[in-house]
Structure formats: structure tokens, C-alpha cells
């Protein structure tokens, strides 16, 4: 099982990490191998029955899925700088080049090559949405790196749903999304619409 979770004991902020711990331990007792990917691992996690992968240590290398990136941008607010810049042209020329490329209908050929390692706080701070989006990029890389080594993807709560979706698109493996609490459970009627949209996307993508 390739599992994505935002926290894992002993570094937890609530019940999410505790639930992840209990589930991975239960799966291990039934002979299931689990790879648990978290934004930031500290090295003191109990790995007797689970392999913990620190997303902050994963180097993402490859090409960007343009359509998936556009879907992310519709739901997540963060500053994105494209890497397909051309030397010796002005910003206006680059904008015209980019617009023409999109209009040509060849966006499926647009593959920005990138190599990046992201540092995650693993917290619930002001840049949480940005970390959620970057975590999805790392998830895609992990799924590539572990090709043939897992049979199912398990994503815990909305924070990891984009990661689960990305891993599914790369691997073609079935996705299980685990809803520990909905945005309505947490916030009542005054929900965060972006969080709700991510929850909805995760549920729709699940198998």
C-alpha cells in the first residue's frame, strides 16, 4: 500500500496521526507492506511495521502534466512560475509565444522539464495550500520511483487527496480516500470552499 498522510506519531497535532499509526500497524499485522509518505519526517517515527518516506527528501525529476497542473490551479491559490522560459526574449514576446502555443491545441506536447526538491513544514500554517499542491508533485514522483511495488493508494483526509490523485494518474493503481472528517464537520456552515472542492475532487477520483 502506498499511503499518504500529513502526520505520524510522535509528531501529531490531533487524531489524524494516531489513526494513521493504528491503521498501518493493523495492516502490517495482516501481512500488508505499507509505504507512508508524509510532508516532513523527523527520523524518530516508529518504522518497525511501516516504511516512512520524507517528502522533503524526494527529488522530483520529470515532466509536468499540463492538464493536471491546470486543474490544481483552479482549486489552489499559490504563485506558480513556469520553467519553459526562453533566453533573450522580452516578457511580452514570451506571453505571445505561450498564448500561441496554447491556442495551437498542442498543449499535450507542453512538458516543462524540472528538477526540484521541496522543503515542507508539515504544519497547518498560512502556506498550507501551497504545501498541499507541492506535496502532490512529490507524490507523483514517489509513485514513479515505486513503480510495481504497490497495489493500492490510500490518502488520508483532504490534505493528501491531490497527492493520491497524482499518484493514481502516474501509476494507474486504484485510489482509496479516507475521510476522517468533512469540512462541514469541522466548520459547520462556514466552510472553506477550497477545502470542500479538494474533498469533492478526492471522492470523485476514488475507486
Enumerate the language-model features and the residues they cover.
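A short beta-strand/loop micro-motif in the catalytic core of glycosyltransferases
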Residues: 153-154, 204-207
Amino acid at each position: 500500500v502506498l499511503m499518504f498522510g500529513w502526520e505520524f506519531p510522535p509528531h501529531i497535532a490531533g487524531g489524524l496521526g494516531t489513526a494513521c499509526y493504528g491503521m498501518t500497524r493493523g495492516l502490517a499485522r495482516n501481512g500488508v507492506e505499507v509505504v507512508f509518505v508524509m510532508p516532513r519526517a523527523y527520523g524518530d517515527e516508529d518504522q518497525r511495521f511501516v516504511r516512512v518516506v520524507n517528502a522533503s527528501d524526494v527529488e522530483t525529476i520529470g515532466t509536468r502534466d499540463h492538464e493536471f497542473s491546470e486543474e490544481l490551479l483552479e482549486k489552489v491559490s499559490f504563485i506558480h512560475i513556469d520553467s519553459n522560459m526562453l533566453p533573450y526574449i522580452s516578457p511580452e514576446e514570451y506571453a505571445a509565444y505561450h498564448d500561441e502555443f496554447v491556442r495551437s491545441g498542442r498543449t499535450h506536447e507542453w512538458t516543462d522539464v524540472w528538477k526540484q526538491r521541496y522543503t515542507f513544514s508539515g504544519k497547518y500554517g498560512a502556506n498550507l495550500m501551497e504545501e498541499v499542491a507541492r506535496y502532490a508533485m512529490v507524490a507523483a514522483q514517489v509513485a514513479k520511483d515505486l513503480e510495481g511495488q504497490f497495489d493500492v493508494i490510500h490518502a488520508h483526509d483532504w490534505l493528501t487527496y491531490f497527492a493520491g490523485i497524482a499518484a493514481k494518474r502516474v501509476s494507474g493503481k486504484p485510489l482509496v480516500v479516507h475521510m476522517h472528517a468533512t469540512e462541514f464537520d469541522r466548520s459547520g456552515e462556514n466552510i472553506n470552499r477550497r477545502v470542500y472542492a479538494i474533498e469533492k475532487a478526492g471522492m470523485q477520483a476514488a475507486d
